[in-house]
Design a protein with these regions (language model features):
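Residues forming the flavin
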Residues: 1-219
Length: 219
């Protein structure tokens, strides 16, 4: 997705790209059920894909949320975007076990159905299936930053493996290592780009204050 979608954005802006990753005439599988996955679905359809299938490892949510149980939590319900309306098969509670290919090109995915047991997703025996794919787009989130990067600096991590950093206005985004700051996904975990932009600006102010003793940058 990180190659597929930006390339299309450039084309939409009028750029001419050589070797653009295209979905036309292909059986496309999108791994990931979030917004990025939906964007991949819509773009693949507009390219002229033969088929588009979207994988989500979590079970299919209900079409309507349980209203009394919602607030203050994010309502859990099936969300259908305009990209889905363009056409795609949505597979829930499915996990990819293996990429299958010939001569360096993907030809399919070996998949298995999963379910929750004791709070963990486990494979359901006897449900392995190979699904045809000419193009596989990865639109998953991530669990935590690459540990080797944080370990190389000696940065403390939280329970989820993210960098620990303060978030107050004085010394904000400072880690336990002097002169090392952390902001965005590496600190808060997988999130939206608007959060990364916000924290990046706040961290820039914190670094400016650290270096200059004051800052005129906005909070």
């Amino acid at each position: 997705a990180m190659e597929f979608l930006p390339q299309q954005n450039k084309v939409n802006a009028g750029d001419k790209l050589k070797g653009q990753l295209r979905a036309e005439g292909k059986n496309v599988i999108v791994i990931g059920g979030g917004d990025t996955g939906s964007d991949c679905v819509g773009t693949s359809n507009r390219h002229g894909a033969v088929s588009v299938t979207q994988f989500e490892v979590m079970p299919q949510p209900p079409e309507e949320e349980n209203r009394p149980m919602t607030w203050p939590y994010w309502p859990i319900k099936l969300r259908t975007s305009s990209s889905h309306d363009e056409g795609c098969e949505r597979e829930f509670a499915i996990s990819t076990k293996e990429f299958i290919g010939e001569k360096g090109k993907v030809t399919g995915l070996k998949t298995v159905r999963v379910e929750f047991k004791d709070g963990k997703l486990v494979e359901i025996p006897g449900t392995e299936v190979v699904m045809k794919a000419d193009l596989v787009l990865l639109a998953m989130g991530f669990v935590s930053p690459v540990a080797a990067v944080l370990d190389a600096f000696g940065i403390d991590k939280d329970a989820r493996g993210n960098a620990k950093a303060t978030v107050d206005f004085t010394g904000g985004y400072a880690t336990n290592v002097p002169k090392v700051f952390a902001a965005g996904d590496i600190r808060r975990g997988q999130s939206l780009v608007v959060w990364a932009i916000r924290e990046g600006r706040q961290a820039a102010r914190a670094v400016d204050e650290f270096l200059m003793g004051y800052s005129d940058l906005p909070r």
